Amino acid sequence: MDAITPKGTLKADEHSHVVRPADMDWKPTRFPGCEVKTLLMDPKTGIMTALMRFAPGAVLPDHEHVNIEQTYVLEGRLVDKEGPAEGIEAKQGEFIWREPGSRHSAWTPEGGLMLAIFQIPNKFYEKDGRVTDSSGQIWDEVWGRIGKD
């Protein structure tokens, strides 16, 4: 994060961080057809900004946005597959944000590329009843403390 530094005590590279996504490799996620380039991740707060690339037909399964989630669609479209907003879609050049507590699954019929901003990682609802983060860790164990310290 960037902030005004009192009396200019820090060098530019100590408070401004340039990320070069073109020089980064796509990392697979546990969700088939979904890859990510993490541009910012703060493990203390859960804030994350990522480029997400989806293959045609890829599904992001049942999940809840614990806080506001923001997505800008760079390519393709993102469609709610299930949930209260089933069928709503954001197309290339459109921006969609979701309120805290919103829950759905989403898919990309033709594939897509998104810039996603999370204030805290999503909760994924597994078929066996566990609630996990995107890496498969138990959400409460990793992220449940945030905002309670």
Residue ranges and their predicted role:
Residues 34, 49, 68:
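Short coil/loop residues immediately preceding or within conserved phosphate-binding loops
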Residues 50-52, 60-65, 82, 87-88, ...:
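Short histidine-centered beta-strand/loop micro-motifs
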Residues 1-46, 130-149:
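A short, N-terminal "cap"/entry segment at the start of jelly-roll beta-barrel domains
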Residues 100-125:
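Ligand-binding loop in jelly-roll beta-barrel domains
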Residues 44-46, 55-58, 77-79, 102, ...:
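Short, charged/polar surface micro-motifs in flexible loops or helix N-caps
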Residues 47, 69, 111:
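Conserved catalytic motifs of the protein kinase core domain
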Residues 56, 65-83:
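Glycine- and acidic-residue-biased ligand/ion/polar-headgroup-sensing regions
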Residues 81-103:
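Short acidic-glycine-tyrosine-enriched beta hairpin
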